[in-house]
A protein has these predicted regions:
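Bacterial N-terminal signal peptides that target proteins for export
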Residues: 1-8
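N-terminal signal peptide c-region/cleavage motif recognized by signal peptidases
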Residues: 17-19
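An ectodomain-focused feature that recognizes extracytoplasmic/extracellular
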Residues: 23-86
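Periplasmic peptidoglycan-binding/tethering modules of Gram-negative envelope proteins
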Residues: 137-219, 285
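Periplasmic OmpA-like peptidoglycan-binding domain that tethers envelope proteins to the cell wall
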Residues: 227-285
Length: 285
């Protein structure tokens, strides 16, 4: 009877220990300290603005906006250890210490895909920036893929946020209102019988020149000149080359290396209804 009692006590202790262990799932927290916290503008051009915050031993948080017709913003949570399976991270905004008793806010759920960083779309990204501006700490909670006993919390520290955020918003306000995709294929039209661009094409060419000044990744620019069917064929072909060469000269003055630009004149060949034009095509990696 005494042996049965000992077995019962041992079993009860084991079950209690197991229950206690399950309830005490560890939370690994990553956050920059007050001394470490920094918000840096790591890209500042008319094509790209990028605000970055390093989370020691975890990775970094990156807000990015690119030149485009529409206002855009993307958030990326870069992780040193990428997800090993699909899961969700709960995004909460936690109040600062000087606002005790205030509950955290549920901001969103972020999909975590295998071997990819986490990303959030424009609306949620702006919400995170607004929370940081008010002194809150957006925090990402998820189950650890590499340990069944742990959860992870990655926290953005709002200390030193205002100066970086102000520089970022200034940069975003100065982004070009068009992207590479908007100008990579452009048809420039001419006044009849001359090498003068129409007003709209002049404006478009100015945009292209401005873009080319800031994008060193442009590999090639192809210019194809065409005329209408009025006048002799030889004269039209020469006019089409002259038009394309004039565009090439304009691009050279904008800083585009001559070896990157290829010129072809087709005159009235490949004729279409409105054929007085130069077709400009750009390529990059």
């Amino acid at each position: 009877m005494q042996n049965y009692g000992l077995v019962f006590i041992s079993l009860a202790c084991a079950l209690a220990a197991q229950s206690s262990f399950a309830d005490a799932k560890q939370l690994r927290q990553y956050s920059a300290s007050i001394e470490q916290s920094a918000w840096q503008l790591t890209a500042k051009t008319p094509l790209l603005c990028q605000l970055e915050h390093v989370i020691p031993n975890f990775g970094s948080a990156v807000f990015q906006s690119k030149a485009s017709k529409a206002l855009n913003l993307n958030f990326e949570l870069k992780m040193l250890r990428l997800p090993d399976a699909y899961s969700l991270a709960e995004v909460l905004s936690l109040p600062p210490a000087w606002r005790p008793g205030e509950p955290g806010k549920s901001v969103a759920s972020m999909s975590l895909l295998k071997q990819f960083n986490g990303e959030l779309p424009k609306k949620t990204a702006w919400t995170l920036l607004t929370e940081l501006e008010q002194g809150f700490s957006p925090t990402f909670y998820y189950a650890d893929w590499y340990s069944p006993y742990d959860q992870v919390a990655a926290r953005l520290n709002p200390v030193q946020f205002p100066p970086g955020y102000f520089a970022f918003t200034e940069c975003v306000a100065r982004l070009l209102p068009f992207s590479f995709e908007d100008i990579a294929f452009t048809v420039l039209s001419y006044e009849s019988g001359s090498d003068q661009l129409t007003p709209e094409s002049k404006r478009r060419l100015g945009q292209i020149a401005e873009y080319l000044q800031h994008d060193p990744q442009i590999e090639s620019v192809e210019l194809q000149g065409y005329t209408d069917s009025y006048g002799g064929r030889w004269m039209n072909e020469q006019l089409s080359v002259k038009r394309a060469e004039k565009i090439k000269q304009f691009l050279a003055e904008a800083g585009v290396a001559g070896e990157k630009v290829q010129v072809d004149g087709f005159g009235e060949r490949r004729h279409v209804a409105t054929n007085r034009r130069v077709v400009l095509q750009m390529a990059r990696p």
